[in-house]
Amino acid sequence: MRGNGALLLDVPNRGRPISQSLFNSPRNVLVPLGSFDQGTGFLQDAGYTVAAVSWELGHGVELPTFKDAEGTTRYIEGTAFAIIRDVADFLSSASTDTVGTRNPLAGAISRTVALGYSQTGRFLKSFLVRGYNSVEGRRLFSGVHILGAASGHINLRSIPGPESGAGTIPTFDNPEVRGVNEEPLAISDVLEQVNSLGQIAPRMIFVNTTTDYFSLRASLGRTGGSGSEDKPLPPNVRMYDIAGASHVLLPGMVPGTGQCKLPYAILDWHPIMRSTLIALDRWLSTNISPPPNELMPLWEAAADAMALRAPNYLPKAIIQIPIRDQDGNANGGVRLPDMVAPLGTHGGQNPPLSFTCSLGSSYSAFAKTKEEREAANDSRLSLMERYKDRSDYVNRIRTAARDLEQRGFLLTEDVAIISHAAAEVTTLK
């Protein structure tokens, strides 16, 4: 397979490359973060060139330090911004480096896309607002694809020193952590700051999950740190909310005693990652616009909503969460077929809202019959009340999948996979 001219620069999350997991994971068989297992082979079959930047193992770490005015030893922070910039610039445009090492991709790259997930999505926004996406007046990344990082930046404030590369985030146990949810928060304000530097902002796609709104304050990426009205997204940005999706998928893992109360989320959101990457690349290479923004409607989180509250240092911030239907499923957004014809409630919060539970969210299956749900005091309609039989269910899944394909949110191969999975459901006859 010849390369398609696109370089995907994978910014690893806490040392773990993300690209194979996000884009090559088969349905219900997650390629782990950090793995170079090709999984479905989607990226390779499409001709993408993937480069991940990470530490070379076995050499130890000698971190540069300096002494501040008070004589305290401080660590030099933010060096990864320059590293990512220089590696991407070398691979995308240089013939050799400064000591004559040949660029293996010389002449093969026409566009460069940065990939970020959660922490490294926040890293990429910080990368942009600090002006690193320009080299000698040239724009470096023409595209940026970010999952799960609508609000906030990389944390270089709360933990100075060796551990800041991993960094902490605000949690339900520690909501006042500084350095992450800092202005500019709204995506429009992030891009405005890039423009103020005299730089041309890249074309960007942001993908959010339901969990991001409950556990990571994603609504601030739409409103900023004040008020509840969405700020208009710039024309070079698309934002897609995946209804019912969790921030992380933990297939095969069962919450243990004293851990999460509910089973982990199971909604497979990888098909949306694949389709939106194709849409972004098409936008860059042919100027064909991606599908319009698809956002979930929000309302202010009540005190008992199991949502991460606004920090005290943002007194005007209003945390908003997706509006749910009578089944507990989020309304609006990009609705995968498993949300259009659900077998349960996807993306619910998962007590006790520890780090893993709050990001893995939950799945709660519907009862099979009316008698079973009434015995369990479950107000949600049972499967037998929702669907005539398995054929009815499968037809609804297929119709929803074809609709998403027509709108640009599913690839043809994923339509077939989703439809086949529906036909194998055993809880309906």
Please report, for each region that a protein language model flagged, where it lies by residue:
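C-terminal His-loop and adjacent cap/lid subdomain of alpha/beta-hydrolase
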Residues: M1-K429
